[in-house]
């Protein structure tokens, strides 16, 4: 796969999905502070079930999941599944193929994860909200690439690749944090069964099984087992994605040969009257077309096929729904001054300053040491501006905030609301400031790509 084409396609997909995400976030704000706020919040607490006799697929430790838990634990597992597919593609044929090629965004991403966490821990030292230290470490790929897309071809492709790869590495870091720090009460029995099913999936991937249903059904089983094992179920999505075959069943050369043969042998049936007006095909013609259809399916790898299938579902349904459910902040109980204290300040500073300092100065250091070159057609000012966009940590930051405080009772709810305020304000200021700086420092003419 052409990695440059993949980058351009990702930016286009995320940019269009980012618009829907903005609308969903604004709606959540408006409704959470409207007369129907009680109905809005009570809806997410409704139980949800998929019952087969006494068995409920959407149950956790014997209790049915709420709508909110279904979104955060089930639908977001699909989101992390797509992230897993993207990571595997980048490692195999993308910007993470070689360490030398990927070193700049990898080092920048590590700096952009470590510094925000350290700033958060410094501001929150001795407090009861330190369990949320990972909140400002993520970069929202949809929003950040959406801002780049607003500037069109003025942005050098090297900077687009840099930010995209950085966001992917950020996702890897976020996945590791969720797996290590947000898993508890491990059930060895469920984990053992999950490992067995995962082994079957891995062997199926190695054998080149390209049936979506095979991965869908067994992946669902792994998700359920993870849900009840104590390991966060979104990790199941990532692991299942790593099992999806990246090689097509049919090589492109064989595909071309097959298509040419089928077209050359396509039956030319004789009709009475005008054959072009006939709406009925013969059996031989149908069989020939089905052979072409089958060959077309086999030349697309399961990994690429699933990525293309899931992109609209992720960008236009799952992520906007997640934002609509989780971004509702009741402003009546929060003073704006609280942004300058406690967890709101820690998250805000971590996103706006921590991400910039971590990303830019890590990049500056390895470029100055001549370990890697400056991205093509880029300047220090444009690199710094893109580093500011790294502070847009909306989706994954909200997700980690929910994991940190969602089950702590009334105290946790208050901390969660203040964390959300810091996330929204930090992401908003980072996005606006990053756009202004890029608009100021990028060349006014379109970049030749």
Predicted regions mapped to residue ranges:
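C-terminal ends of transmembrane helices
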Residues: 2-8, 81-97, 145-156, 199-210, ...
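Entry/N-cap segments of selected transmembrane alpha helices
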Residues: 90-118, 187, 191-196, 332-357, ...
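Functional cores that coordinate and move charged inorganic groups
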Residues: 148-260
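Structural signature of hydrophobic alpha-helical transmembrane segments
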Residues: 69-80, 128-142, 183-196, 234, ...
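Transmembrane alpha-helix boundary signature
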Residues: 31-43, 55-66, 82-98, 115-134
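Hydrophobic transmembrane alpha-helices of secondary-active transporters
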Residues: 54-60, 64, 69-93, 313-334, ...
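Hydrophobic core segments of alpha-helical transmembrane domains in multi-pass membrane transport
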Residues: 21-33, 79-85, 115-117, 197-202, ...
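Predominantly late transmembrane helices and immediately cytosolic-facing juxtamembrane segments
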Residues: 2-9, 13, 214-218, 233-376, ...
């Amino acid at each position: 796969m052409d990695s440059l084409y993949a980058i351009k396609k990702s930016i286009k997909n995320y940019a269009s999905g980012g618009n829907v995400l903005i609308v969903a976030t604004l709606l959540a704000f408006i409704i959470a502070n409207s007369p129907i706020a009680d109905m809005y919040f009570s809806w997410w607490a409704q139980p949800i079930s998929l019952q087969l006799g006494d068995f409920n697929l959407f149950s956790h430790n014997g209790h049915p999941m709420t709508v909110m838990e279904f979104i955060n634990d089930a639908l977001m597992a699909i989101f992390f599944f797509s992230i897993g597919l993207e990571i595997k593609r980048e490692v195999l044929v993308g910007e993470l193929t070689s360490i030398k090629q990927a070193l700049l965004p990898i080092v920048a991403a590590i700096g952009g994860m470590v510094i925000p966490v350290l700033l958060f821990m410094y501001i929150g030292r001795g407090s009861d909200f330190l369990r949320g230290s990972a909140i400002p470490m993520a970069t929202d790929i949809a929003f950040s690439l959406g801002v780049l897309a607003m500037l069109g071809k003025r942005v050098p492709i090297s900077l687009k690749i840099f930010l995209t790869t950085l966001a992917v590495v950020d996702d890897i870091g976020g996945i590791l944090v969720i797996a290590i720090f947000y898993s508890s009460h491990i059930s060895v029995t469920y984990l053992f069964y999950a490992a067995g099913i995962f082994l079957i999936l891995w062997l199926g991937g190695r054998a080149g099984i390209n049936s979506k249903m095979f991965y869908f059904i067994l992946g669902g089983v792994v998700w359920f087992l993870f849900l009840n094992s104590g390991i966060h179920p979104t990790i199941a999505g990532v692991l299942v994605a790593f099992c999806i075959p990246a090689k097509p069943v049919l090589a492109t050369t064989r595909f071309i040969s097959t298509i040419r043969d089928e077209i050359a042998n396509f039956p030319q049936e004789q009709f009475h009257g005008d054959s072009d007006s006939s709406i009925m095909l013969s059996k031989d013609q149908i069989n020939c077309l089905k052979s072409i259809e089958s060959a077309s399916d086999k030349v697309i790898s399961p990994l690429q096929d699933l990525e293309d299938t899931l992109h609209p579902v992720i960008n236009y349904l799952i992520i906007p729904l997640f934002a609509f459910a989780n971004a509702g902040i009741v402003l009546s109980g929060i003073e704006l001054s609280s942004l300058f204290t406690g967890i709101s300040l820690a998250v805000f500073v971590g996103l706006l300053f921590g991400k910039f300092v971590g990303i830019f100065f890590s990049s500056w250091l390895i470029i100055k040491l001549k370990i890697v070159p400056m991205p093509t057609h880029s300047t220090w000012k444009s690199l710094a501006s893109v580093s500011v966009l790294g502070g847009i940590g909306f989706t994954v930051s909200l997700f980690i905030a929910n994991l940190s405080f969602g089950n702590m009772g009334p105290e946790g709810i208050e901390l969660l609301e203040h964390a959300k305020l810091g996330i929204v304000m930090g992401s908003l200021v980072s996005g606006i400031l990053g756009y202004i700086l890029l608009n100021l420092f990028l060349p006014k003419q379109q970049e030749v790509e």
